[in-house]
Each structure stands twice: as C-alpha cells, then as structure tokens.
UniProtKB/Swiss-Prot annotation:
It comes from Idiomarina loihiensis (strain ATCC BAA-735 / DSM 15497 / L2-TR). It is a peripheral membrane protein. Part of the ABC transporter complex CcmAB involved in the biogenesis of c-type cytochromes; once thought to export heme, this seems not to be the case, but its exact role is uncertain. Responsible for energy coupling to the transport system. This is Cytochrome c biogenesis ATP-binding export protein CcmA. It is found in: Cell inner membrane. Keywords: ATP-binding, Cell inner membrane, Cell membrane, Cytochrome c-type biogenesis, Membrane, Nucleotide-binding, Translocase, Transport. One of its GO terms (molecular function) is ATP binding.
Amino acid sequence: MTQVASTNSPLLHAEQLSSIRGGRVLFENLDFSVSAGQLWQVSGPNGAGKSSLLRILTGLLEPSDGVVSFDGQPLNQNWSEYCQQLLFIGHKAAVKGELSALENFHWQQQLSSVQDVDAWDLLEKLGLLGLEDELTTRLSAGQQRRVALTRLWATQASLWILDEPFTALDVQGIALLQQRFVEHLDAGGTIIFTSHQSLTLSGLTPEKLSLEYRGEVL
C-alpha cells in the first residue's frame, strides 16, 4: 500500500485504487488525498501507470478497484460539478485540428471568458511564433503539446491534471510554465502532474507520489 498524508480537508481523495491493464498490474491499493491549493507530482518510469492514474482521477478510465471522490463524493455522484472545475491535458495533446495554433487559444478563451492574456507574447514564449497560422494537424507532436498548454492561460478551472506538461519545452518554456503554476497555486488552485524524470521546480515544492514499474502479469 502507498499512502501519502494530507493535513487539509481533501479536495480529491483516492481510496484503494488499483489498475490492471492487459493482464498486467500497474498499481494497487493506492491511498492519497489532495487538498485545495496543493501541487502534486506523480513520478515513475514509463509503464508504471502514471497516465492511467491520471485518467482514473479525471473519470475517463475506470479503476480495476477503488474509488475516487471529489469534495467528499464519488465522481459518479457529482460528475457535472467536477467537470466544471477540471482541466485535463493528456499525454497526447487534445487540440482542434481544424483550427490554427492561434485559433485554438482564442477558442479556449471564448469558452472560459478569459480575455486578459497577450496571445502573441504567450505563443512567442512557448516557441510557437511563426506557427500561429498553421493548422495544428500540420504541427509536430511537441508543437501540438505546446498549443495544448496555452489552455492553462485561458481557463477558470481550479483543478489542473496534466500528463507530462514539461515534455517538449525548452528552458524558456519550462520557466514560463513554472511561473504559471505559481500563479495558479497562489490563486488557490490545485495541480496534479506527471513526470518520468526528476524535476527541480524553482520556488515550488510538490507533494510526491512515486509509482514503480511492477511488470506483474496475471
């Protein structure tokens, strides 16, 4: 059993979570609680189940066993409220392929009514300037991930669940994303993100949940 203690009232609680995929045990009997305003880093090697855990926490994937609760209730009992508070960016970037990089950002702004962001400055800092008019289907996987990350500057969601958000970012992009993390946490937001490698985040000390590659086949 893996258990990480939380001192505050939990926003998100996982109880006895287990995941078995393709006959292989990814993890089992995970217990942890995430409080509002916390930053959590889920780490571990490829194949340890990090992405599966995040998808379970978002409700997109059913656990093999266990329950995820939001604000004291199982996800299936307050799904609508949960979705209003959640922003999920998976390992495979979810972008609208029929829109350009710039249009993707403006589309997200319209959905969230967040307008006080300089889109051109943001695209430049994420290394997307010069690609703003390209359809996202023509961009590389790394470029698409950076387009998806622009959503973090155009959302009012309080809970962010992000799969490998620092992948494909250069030094400037990493610094920019770290600053956005700080802004969101200072505003009372909550972040859960994965990383397959050890990260040193300037000014940030995340709670850590480490998964191991088990390789057990049932």
